[in-house]
Amino acid sequence: MQTKNVLNIFPSFLIGIALLILPSISFAGGHSLDELIAAAQKEGEVATYWHSSRMGKKVAKAFEKKYGVKVLATKMKDSEMTERIVREVSSGNVIVDLVGYDDGPMLDTVLTPQGFVENYVPPFLINNIPSNSRDPLIYLWQPFVFGYNSETYGDNCPIKSLWQLTEKEWSGRFHMWDPRIASSMLQMFSAMEDRSEDLVASYKKHYGKDLKLTEANAGLEFVKRLAANKPVLYNEDYEIAVSVGTRGQDKAPIGIYSLGRHRENKKKNLALALCDVHPFKGLNQPTYMQIVKGAPHPNAAKLLAYYVLTQEGANPWVGVVGAYSSNSSLGS
């Protein structure tokens, strides 16, 4: 692969990544909400590592204004976040309190079983959080979709099957997150392996013949062929959206990016459109929220976790097209 400085909306087609995650140990507190607010205010601040800059740019100010508790927010990739959490807890010098984290498999295999994080579901909201989003706590769902340039190709996506991305015509013309940076891509490939039968059927539907495997299953076969076809890799999905949607291209690429990037059509005059492809239109990416073991401000962390699951705290994310909170009582 080349590097470039690179299912609830569609129920039967978006891969549900959270299905791959096993339950963790629940961590709860006994405060009433008023008691929790008082305890958090006494602590005075809360430190976060977060997958999104919106925590620092939008949530932090509103939270401090509402509760008088300062939020020290650092945007961070999952890989760095994992390293810091492990190092801080292992050394007994914990700086961070609450994390917003995308890498479910790492959470399930390392951070939770080895005691680096603790699950907390605000008891004041528990009836609004579906049971399959509580343990580990999912606070946000973000659909990632396959998209194309509607100015270049018109009303119809230039491919009908994902297998076409492995053909010579699309060599170097599929743009995606670097799997070494974005765990969601590895999770997508893992989910494809679990859904190999769908890939087999898609191949037969498109080409009219059976898929010949050189790997153990169709999921691995697809990943092998895709990697051989030189996809272009990026560090940020914003860059993918721009590369796909920029106007004036004769052979615009296809990409996978968060559905919310379609807001750039208006902001940046892009021409992004959804690909109606089989067997999957994209994936439904969960983001988890966990308290770090030994957090210096545990009550402020719990209050912030609660706030992010309320309408006011969730607005910076759920106000974006496609994203929605795990709190079923909120609008999206």
Regions found by a protein language model. Give the residues of each.
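Bacterial N-terminal signal peptides that target proteins for export
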Residues: 2-14
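N-terminal signal peptide c-region/cleavage motif recognized by signal peptidases
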Residues: 23-26
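Extracytoplasmic ligand-binding site segments that recognize negatively charged/polar headgroups
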Residues: 49-60, 72-86, 94-245
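Short, polar/charged alpha-helical segment
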Residues: 32-41, 49-70
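Periplasmic-binding protein-like
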Residues: 127-128, 141-144, 220-226, 268-295
